[in-house]
């Protein structure tokens, strides 16, 4: 199965980080998309080709975002690239030397996401094995990577296959990026770095191969 933003391949991708690995990105200036990825050329194959595509195809009709902010979201959602995977892999290292080349893009991308209205909705995300034991009792998990979810469960199930864990997440601060995505039909909602998650109820098992786990986002002030 090809890489997909809605599916994780191991539980560490969700829960390893327990501190803010991007502290200081806020000090970066807001650059153009081209300038924001210059330090990534040696890290992400063909990144400038993807930028060129994003600058041609991004949503140019929004009054919410600048052209470069809109293109940054488009870049993140281009299918078949290693961009989103490389970004989240860097975030999960918690290593500032690894993350610093990403700071300019993070500044542009997060600036764009923060301009979008927050949505309260039930969204869906998957992991391709039984991960129900990760979430126990009232334990709160902090996700420092960007977590892509969908408001359409079928968009996630089509990538998950016949086994794994499907998360139904009640979010309170999700960012609906469908209007700016390269794949608008996926109805994507992004959970921002630092999102706090806990289990809401017991998981549901289907034939001991497929699990549904109900999670909820917790307000950062709770």
Language-model features, listed with the residues they occupy:
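Conserved NAD+-utilizing ADP-ribose enzyme module
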Residues: 1-43, 179-222
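Internal glycine-rich, Lys/Arg-flanked active-site/core loops of soluble domains
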Residues: 34-180
